[in-house]
Amino acid sequence: MHSTIAYVSLLPLALFVAMHGASTDEESEELGASTDVDYEELDANCTCPAPALTSTRNNKHYPLGCIYNCSSYNCTIPDGTPCYVLTLGEVKEHLQIGSTVPNCTCGLCRNGTCVSNGTVEECFAVEEIEET
């Protein structure tokens, strides 16, 4: 009887852990990873790729902003990393209309903020952009 109670009590926990791990892996696979982020400099908990868009100018991936969520952790991209001054919400709005984002403001990460360098270019999503 006691083993049945233990099994029934632990089943929801096991299901939660299994589902939580699976969704994180699936979401991570959907992201376009930035090629310019030095992931070795990130916190050990920041193992997910940053949500990124691809430049039509040079076909490189740049992160959206300089802070992103990875498995409930806020991850800050290193200073000096090229980025786009865009939010995930803004990108999703544009991608509902077409396949590109016409006004991607370029910048560099500084203390967790993507600071504009005054350049604007067209960018696009290679894969579905989701937050992890």
Curated annotation (Swiss-Prot):
Main location, first listed in the record: secreted
Cystine pairings recorded for this chain: C48-C70, C66-C109, C83-C114, C104-C123
Keywords: Disulfide bond, Glycoprotein, Secreted, Signal
Domain of life: Eukaryota
Residues of the signal peptide: 1-24
Transmembrane segment boundaries: none
Location of the protein in the cell: Secreted
Protein's name according to its UniProt entry: Evasin P985
Organism encoding this protein: Amblyomma parvum
